[in-house]
């Protein structure tokens, strides 16, 4: 199963540098904290619509080439993050199989739990970068995060109903 928002997410084109944008946009696009937490701070009930969770081969995660270690299998999770039932964000997480050892194995079992609820409670979380992307009228971003030094790639597309617009 797929979703049109995930097709748009995969079509994001990234800027070489942070573009000169309105402060409101940059505030959302460069947020270092959890989007789940940000949505909840707006008084919204946050839920996850799980689109896909599975191991996939390299050919299904080409956007990770050069950003993650080259491996034969990756854990792929695709979701819609909803605020009061309305989709505000499409998310795609690519996790190399080698990252899934020790406590990070929980990444395979999040189900309908928002990723941010796990990531941003970890004292071992670091972020290597945030890149801003755009597809037509929609904005997105991707980040390489590390848990205990082990990488994963998180891509987020802000959907039309989100407060970014």
From Swiss-Prot:
Biological or metabolic pathway of the protein: Cofactor biosynthesis; ubiquinone biosynthesis
Catalysed reactions, semicolon-separated: chorismate = 4-hydroxybenzoate + pyruvate
A single MF term (Gene Ontology): chorismate lyase activity
EC number: 4.1.3.40
Subcellular location: Cytoplasm
UniProt key word Aminoacyl-tRNA synthetase: no
Top-rank taxon: Bacteria
Key words of the record: Cytoplasm, Lyase, Pyruvate, Ubiquinone biosynthesis
GO CC terms in record: cytosol
Chief location of this protein within or outside the cell: cytoplasm
UniProt binding sites for substrate: 35, 77, 115, 156
GO biological process, one term: pyruvate biosynthetic process
EC main group: lyase
Family designation: Belongs to the UbiC family.
Subunit structure: Monomer.
Record's function text: Removes the pyruvyl group from chorismate, with concomitant aromatization of the ring, to provide 4-hydroxybenzoate (4HB) for the ubiquinone pathway.
UniProt cross-references to HAMAP family, sorted A to Z: UbiC (MF_01632)
Listed name of the protein: Chorismate pyruvate-lyase
Species this protein is from: Salmonella schwarzengrund (strain CVM19633)
């Amino acid at each position: 199963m797929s979703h049109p928002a995930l097709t748009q997410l995969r079509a994001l084109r990234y800027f070489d540098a942070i573009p000169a944008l309105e402060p409101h946009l940059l505030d959302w696009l460069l947020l270092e904290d959890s989007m789940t937490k940000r949505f909840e701070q707006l008084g919204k009930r946050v839920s996850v619509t799980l689109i896909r969770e599975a191991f996939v081969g390299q050919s299904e995660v080409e956007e990770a080439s050069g950003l993650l270690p080259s491996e034969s299998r990756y854990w792929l999770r695709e979701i819609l993050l909803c605020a009061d039932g309305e989709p505000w964000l499409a998310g795609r997480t690519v996790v190399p199989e080698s990252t899934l050892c020790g406590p990070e194995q929980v990444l395979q079992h999040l189900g309908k739990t928002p990723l941010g609820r796990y990531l941003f409670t970890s004292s071992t979380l670091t972020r290597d970068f945030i890149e801003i992307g755009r597809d037509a009228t929609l904005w997105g971003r991707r980040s390489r995060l590390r848990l205990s030094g082990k990488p994963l790639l998180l891509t987020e597309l802000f959907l039309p109903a989100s407060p970014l617009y």
